[in-house]
Amino acid sequence: MYKRQASGFKDERIIGIRMSTRPDYINKEILEQCVEFGVKTIELGVQSASNRVLELNRRGHVFEDVIRAAEMIKSFGIELGLQMMLGMYGSDPETDIETCRKIIELEPKCTRIYPTLVLSGTALESLYIRGEYIPYTLETAVSTAKRCLLMFRKAGVEVIRIGLYPGEDLRSEGNIVAGPFHSAFGELVENAVYKDKIEEEIIQKRLRDCDYEIIAPSSETSKIIGQKKCNKEYFFKKYGVRIKVKNRLG
């Protein structure tokens, strides 16, 4: 059925077919079919580069499977996407940063960064109830995601999503038991990036009790000011600096 659907997409000149799968599902025959039916991008759920973390979370694959699958995908001329999860059972911020480094070494076209949430009815919920798993706080998740985002950008890897899509299934009552969920998680990460940049400028220029104008596209204004103007308030309270954003086209 999926082959027929993909073939129909190709016939209609839809050229952007994107697929997501496990790294241990990739083989030569599957990739040949993907090429035949016009698949442009394959994303792999890496989750972690630590085999210990993968085993603890019963992922059913090791990081060597990711390396093998990534190289095969690229050898077929298909764009590679890699997805990582922050704060998995058995992980910590430095382990997550190492996962980011190893993902960069595989030279993907794009990546996604997801925080781990404790969902109702899962094995992770049982670990959480027993006190064996402590999820990241929102602050830790944002801080770690920020570090990964900056590393990916420096390496030229496009980050196409930060945070889980807040759909109805995820947000249904009682579904999220614990963890760093925020409907605008990606925006919080971008806020943190701008906060660091602006604070560095304020310190370097020794700004105090003054207006500080930032020229930026209108699309960046909310990221600079922060959720509920948190960045703006932070700089005024700490330095007496009043952030003002002047929009330019772009």
Model-derived regions, located:
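Short, charged low-complexity intrinsically disordered segments located at boundaries
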Residues: 1, 30-38, 49, 177-182, ...
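Conserved non-cysteine loop/helix-boundary elements of the Radical SAM core domain that shape
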Residues: 3-116, 120-140
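Auxiliary Fe-S-binding modules of radical SAM enzymes
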Residues: 123, 130-250
